Curated annotation (Swiss-Prot):
The keyword Transmembrane helix applies. Residues 1-22 form the signal peptide. InterPro entries: Arteri_GP4. This is Glycoprotein 4. It comes from Porcine reproductive and respiratory syndrome virus (strain Lelystad).
């Protein structure tokens, strides 16, 4: 009887354990009441051919015939997703701009994780806006990539259209704007 009870309790504990998430905070306690809504774009599918590293004046057909398809080029097929994030700003001082910068950094992180195949969930974790992914999937991904000992870049970042220089200028301008608002 004791063994049966022990097995029952162990089984109940396994059922009650919730899913673990690895979260990256957006470093802001001034944004609260986070709500997200992800909906699929109804009625259509996207086929996107990303041509990259093609010499100037060479067409896609000529490149495929002469060189084959480059490993850096991808064709993306899928249904676009509309993601709505709603947040209330509780402090209207210079921290408002800092909050927006931190949130944009979180969105870049989320786009990278989404590009790698993770389902990103935004949530309020202990009062801090965070981008979360499934912990088991994250550990498997890190383990897989740390076991590979080569540093070949075999993908391009589809969602990153801003260069590091543009991001530095955007950060500088936003910080100057925050200082002017504080004065």
């Amino acid at each position: 009887m004791a063994a049966a009870t022990l097995f029952f309790l162990a089984g109940a504990q396994h059922i009650m354990v919730s899913e673990a998430f690895a979260c990256k905070p957006c470093f802001s306690t001034h944004l609260s009441d986070i709500e997200t809504n992800t909906t699929a774009a109804a009625g259509f599918m996207v086929l996107q051919d990303i041509n990259c590293f093609r010499p100037h004046g060479v067409s896609a057909a000529q490149e495929k015939i002469s060189f084959g398809k480059s490993s850096q080029c991808r064709e993306a097929v899928g249904t676009p997703q509309y993601i709505t994030i709603t947040a209330n700003v509780t402090d209207e001082s210079y921290l408002y701009n800092a909050d927006l910068l931190m949130l944009s950094a979180c969105l870049f992180y989320a786009s990278e994780m989404s590009e790698k195949g993770f389902k990103v969930i935004f949530g309020n974790v202990s009062g801090v806006v965070s981008a979360c992914v499934n912990f088991t999937d994250y550990v498997a991904h890190v383990t897989q990539h740390t076991q590979q000992h080569h540093l070949v870049i075999d993908h391009i970042r589809l969602l990153h259209f801003l260069t590091p220089s543009a991001m530095r200028w955007a950060t500088t301008i936003a910080c100057l704007f925050a200082i002017l608002l504080a004065i």
